[in-house]
């Protein structure tokens, strides 16, 4: 089984990265063997969308006219059995660099599926997705909703939790001190649930 995680923070060793790693570790405890890869947005090149999507994306399924790391990261997502998306909240939104990635991928999918002459099914369709959000001074639920909207728009299946905040792992400030969202506990729950969802999908596909 293969899991691919994306840390949307501009810092590679802080709370978002820690919680994404904890979800992966929980998956490792729940299933074996597990091949895991985590990439950091801060270490990748994601240019802003140039709005060439209507003429280009409509005729090039799920590809972008701009050549950078967006295509490589999308390919890793497509190849994975499960995806983890993690991001902090900056000013009412995730970091601009990570948002550029989200915007580019969403545009590829939207314009191919709505403008393209041929309809190629989403290559991300049905892939289980776990969500992680961190907010220092506000509620992380806004970022969870943001990630949930993106993942469903491209066809992935966000894995929900049985307890608050339901959409994924949320943390308010330092996760070690957060007794409301209980991020470390939720990370373990999400990893186990994500492993089950990925295994069920593989079994259904005869993998």
Where are these regions (language model features)?
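N-terminal beta1-alpha1-beta2 submodule of the flavodoxin-like/Rossmannoid cofactor-binding fold
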Residues: 1-110, 114-115, 177-207
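Short beta-strand elements in bilobed, periplasmic/extracellular small-molecule ligand-binding domains
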Residues: 33-40, 156-166
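Short, glycine-/small-residue-rich phosphate/pyrophosphate-handling segment
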Residues: 114-161
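Cofactor-binding loop segments of dinucleotide-utilizing enzymes, especially the Rossmann-like FAD-
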Residues: 8-9, 41, 133-136, 163
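A short acidic, helix-capping loop that chelates divalent metal ions and anchors anionic groups
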Residues: 168-175
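Short, well-ordered secondary-structure micro-motifs
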Residues: 49-50, 142, 171
């Amino acid at each position: 089984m293969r899991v691919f995680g994306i840390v949307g923070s501009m810092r590679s060793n802080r709370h978002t990265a820690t919680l994404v790693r904890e979800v992966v570790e929980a998956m490792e405890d729940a299933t074996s063997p597990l091949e895991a890869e985590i990439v950091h947005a801060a270490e990748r090149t994601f240019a802003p969308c140039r709005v060439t999507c209507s003429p280009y994306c409509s005729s090039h399924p799920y590809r972008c006219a701009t050549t950078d790391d967006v295509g490589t990261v999308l390919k890793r997502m497509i190849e994975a059995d499960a995806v983890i998306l993690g991001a902090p909240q900056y000013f009412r939104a995730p970091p601009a660099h990570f948002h550029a990635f989200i915007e580019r991928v969403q545009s590829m999918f939207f314009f191919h599926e709505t403008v393209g002459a041929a309809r190629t099914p989403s290559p991300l369709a049905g892939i289980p997705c776990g969500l992680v959000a961190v907010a220092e001074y506000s509620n992380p639920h806004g970022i969870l909703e943001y990630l949930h909207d993106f993942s469903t728009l491209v066809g992935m299946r966000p894995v929900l939790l049985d307890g608050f905040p339901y959409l994924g792992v949320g943390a308010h400030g330092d996760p070690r001190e957060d007794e409301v969202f209980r991020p470390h506990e939720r990370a373990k729950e999400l990893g186990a649930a994500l492993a089950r969802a990925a295994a069920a999908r593989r079994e259904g596909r005869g993998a």
